[in-house]
């Protein structure tokens, strides 16, 4: 193993991935070759002037000229780019065994047990390779268990790139995808109290009674869909939603919303599937999972997870109850060639260990509180900031042309992220149904100095734009 480790250069330099800098070719050359060989529909950040990564370390990325950038985008690299403990765990397992899951491995069971220790009420895990796979499998589980076909999703939802999950994703089928909304998918209003169907006034956004009432209205919308589906002699297998909506604009649902929806869905024989692919493993700070945010007793029937759990290594999973898992496929078993392989499981175990050893839940909570204070102060100064919403290290800044009308300002959002990159070395992304939400979802090692740097730069950019 030491020969492999030395050859890869993982532990021979104090700078992670230092070996990568020895083979950095011009961005122009790589982009030309990319255009010739990679599908034109493969998305890329900063498409007019793509960012080329030569190496990465913790919360920083380095371009082809070794310029350093603060990464506020990469929630996948959960505990930090090339975190040495994760790199070590992956490297050791890679040099030990990569045998698939039809052999018995301690890593598979250890990994499943550790995940389940954070999910009360669930007792079974099935492994996959991506969030898209996990969400596809979750729907199959729900259908096989309930014997129903239909699904309820929420506006602007994104659940993956495979055909089934694109059919579950208004984020795709409402925006020109060749995959259209099927008859069995029903779209409920997004529980967004700032832009949604049951929006609140600015002075009501922190009013608990108003938030509860809005949440009740949104859950009643789901109840209406369930009644309509049943009236047509159909059945809903599952309500499917992200715990906190990410691509849809960093939306935090009101307290008790999921709990009330669960009552309605289960009364109609369906299951609750919560997609934690973007928000799990401590990003929200207070809890390990975003659906646990409110401590309201809500327990999903199925939880899907992916992105952060491998810190960049491909791995995902579905957690559920044994009786649901046992219904999968009838007489046909479940096998996934790479899902749950020992290297992937080693990555997950090491990520969870780093989260614990480095107190990253507490750190994310503390950084989130400091970030909120800084962003609220920024909102008071800049009229273009219509709303600030988030928790832990999961935040959205809603940019508007006018606070009264809340008209989204896509042009400003795009100009802002370009200016932050060019002049300040800060990488942010804009998303949401109107592409006007600045998303802050960095690696969890993001610190107080990073917050100050980001907010100061954002303040200066908006000031220069007279906004």
Curated annotation (Swiss-Prot):
Which InterPro entries does the entry mention? Aminotrans_3, Aminotrans_3_PPA_site, PyrdxlP-dep_Trfase, PyrdxlP-dep_Trfase_major, PyrdxlP-dep_Trfase_small
Question: What is the E.C. number?
Answer: 4.2.3.-
Co-factor requirement: pyridoxal 5'-phosphate
CDD domains for the chain:
OAT_like
Superkingdom, natural source: Eukaryota
**Gene3D superfamilies, alphabetically?**
Aspartate Aminotransferase, domain 1 (3.90.1150.10), Type I PLP-dependent aspartate aminotransferase-like (Major domain) (3.40.640.10)
* The keyword Lyase appears for this protein: yes
- Keyword Phosphoprotein listed: no
Q: Which GO terms describe its molecular function?
A: lyase activity; pyridoxal phosphate binding; transaminase activity
**Which residues are recorded as modified (N6-(pyridoxal phosphate)lysine)?**
307
Keywords for this protein: Lyase, Pyridoxal phosphate
Q: Which SUPFAM superfamilies match?
A: PLP-dependent transferases (SSF53383)
Please provide an example of a Pfam family that matches this protein in its UniProt record: Aminotran_3
PANTHER family per UniProt: ALANINE--GLYOXYLATE AMINOTRANSFERASE 2-LIKE, PTHR45688
| UniProt similarity note | Belongs to the class-III pyridoxal-phosphate-dependent aminotransferase family.
Q: What is this protein called?
A: Ethanolamine-phosphate phospho-lyase homolog 1
The taxonomic lineage of its organism, from the top, reads: Eukaryota, Metazoa, Ecdysozoa, Nematoda, Chromadorea
UniProt lists the gene as eppl-1
């Amino acid at each position: 193993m030491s020969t492999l480790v030395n050859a890869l250069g993982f532990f021979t330099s104090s700078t992670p991935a230092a070996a990568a800098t020895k083979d950095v070719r011009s961005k122009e050359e790589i982009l030309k070759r990319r255009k010739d060989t990679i599908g034109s529909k493969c998305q890329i950040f900063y498409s007019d002037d793509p960012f080329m990564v030569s190496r990465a370390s913790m919360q920083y990325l380095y371009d082809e000229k070794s310029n350093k950038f603060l990464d506020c985008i990469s929630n996948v690299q959960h505990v930090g780019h090339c975190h040495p403990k994760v790199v070590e765990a992956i490297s050791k397992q890679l040099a030990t065994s990569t045998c698939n899951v039809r052999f018995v491995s301690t890593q598979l069971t250890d990994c499943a047990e550790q995940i389940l220790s954070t999910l009360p009420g669930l007792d079974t895990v099935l492994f996959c390779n991506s969030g898209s796979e996990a969400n596809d499998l979750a729907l199959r589980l729900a259908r096989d268990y309930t014997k129903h076909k239909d699904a309820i999703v929420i506006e602007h939802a994104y659940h993956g790139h495979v055909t089934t999950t694109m059919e579950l994703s208004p984020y795709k089928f409402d925006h020109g995808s060749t995959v259209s909304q099927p008859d069995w998918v029903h779209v409920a209003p997004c529980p967004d109290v700032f832009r949604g169907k049951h929006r609140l006034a600015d002075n009501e956004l922190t009013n608990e009674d108003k938030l509860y009432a809005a949440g009740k209205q949104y859950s009643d919308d789901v109840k209406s869909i369930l009644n309509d589906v049943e009236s047509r002699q159909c059945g809903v297998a599952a309500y499917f939603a992200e715990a906190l909506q990410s691509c849809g604009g960093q939306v935090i649902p009101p307290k008790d919303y999921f709990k009330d929806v669960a009552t309605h869905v289960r009364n109609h024989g369906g299951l609750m599937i919560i997609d934690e692919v973007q928000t799990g493993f401590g990003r929200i700070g207070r809890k390990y999972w975003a659906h646990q945010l409110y401590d309201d007793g809500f327990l999903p029937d199925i939880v899907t997870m992916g992105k952060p759990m491998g810190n960049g290594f491909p791995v995902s999973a579905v957690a559920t109850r044994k009786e649901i898992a046992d219904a999968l496929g009838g007489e046909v078993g479940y096998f996934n060639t790479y899902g749950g392989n020992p290297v992937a499981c080693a990555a997950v175990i090491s990520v969870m260990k780093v989260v614990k050893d480095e107190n990253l839940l507490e750190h994310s909570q503390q950084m989130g509180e400091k970030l909120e204070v800084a962003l609220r102060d920024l909102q008071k100064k800049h009229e273009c900031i219509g709303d600030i919403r988030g928790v832990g290290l999961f935040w959205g800044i809603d940019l508007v042309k006018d606070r009264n009308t809340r008209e989204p300002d896509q042009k400003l959002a795009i100009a802002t992220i370009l200016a932050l990159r060019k002049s300040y070395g800060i990488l942010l992304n804009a998303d949401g149904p109107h592409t006007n939400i600045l998303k802050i979802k960095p690696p969890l090692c993001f610190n107080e100095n990073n917050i100050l740097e980001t907010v100061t730069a954002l303040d200066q950019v908006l000031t220069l734009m007279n906004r």
